[in-house]
Design a protein with these regions (language model features):
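Short helix-kink/termination motifs in transmembrane helices of multi-pass secondary transporters
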Residues: 4, 73, 138-139
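Small-residue-rich hydrophobic transmembrane alpha-helices
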Residues: 9-75, 106-125
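Short runs within selected transmembrane alpha-helices of multi-pass transporters and secretion channels
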Residues: 26-30, 99-118, 124-136, 140, ...
């Protein structure tokens, strides 16, 4: 960021404020989703937890999509009110457009991860996120900025390059049902029946 123009830095400052509002709301949604799923896993009602998980992931994606569309609809007066004009306004608008697409997938990944953790699978999502960050995102962003001197908005978009790939992997893991790993007595009492039904080895 320190190597970007003043206009880009101004746009980032405004964008981070708006992003923070979105994250504040949907992190609460994600926490609620993890409680709703984790409670059922702990009680041994794994089928309910399984069905509830994918419904909550899609509900979150739908809500964040609606929120981003609303943000885009009012972006012009909003960005002007926050002091962006000219080039900084153009960059800020571009960032909102990119984020509106990326956020739907990103928040879906967030809910996936929190749901897996609440069901006893604390490692899968976290390992995936860290691996993609260091093996894909950082090399891409570094190369785009320092080697190819790409436009700022392209560099910004590359920050989300891992999200669609992780989403597909997260979806496959969710439907595999392998993330349901109870530790409570009630959960352990019914887990074998659930695994047999879903073909989990």
């Amino acid at each position: 960021l320190g190597h970007q123009s003043e206009q880009a830095i101004a746009a980032v400052a405004v964008f981070r404020t708006l992003e923070g509002l979105v994250i504040a709301f949907f992190s609460g949604f994600s926490n609620a989703a993890s409680v709703l799923v984790g409670k059922e896993v702990g009680a041994g009602r794994h089928e309910i937890a399984y069905e509830r998980a994918w419904r909550l992931v899609y509900l979150c994606s739908g809500l964040i999509g609606a929120a981003c569309l609303t943000l885009l609809a009012i972006h012009e007066p909003l960005l002007h009110a926050m002091g962006l004009h000219g080039e900084s306004y153009r960059i800020g608008t571009g960032m909102l457009l990119i984020y509106s697409v990326a956020a739907v997938i990103r928040m879906g990944n967030w809910v996936h991860n929190d749901t897996y953790r609440s069901a006893g699978d604390a490692a899968f999502g976290s390992i995936l996120e860290i691996a993609f960050m260091y093996l894909l995102v950082l090399p891409l962003v570094y190369s785009a900025n320092y080697v190819f001197h790409a436009p700022f908005l392209l560099i910004f978009a590359l920050c989300y390059a891992d999200e669609p790939i992780r989403y597909l992997i997260m979806q496959r893991h969710m439907y595999s049902a392998r993330w349901i790993r109870p530790v409570s007595a009630a959960g352990l009492a019914t887990i074998e029946e659930f695994r047999e039904k879903h073909g989990v080895n």
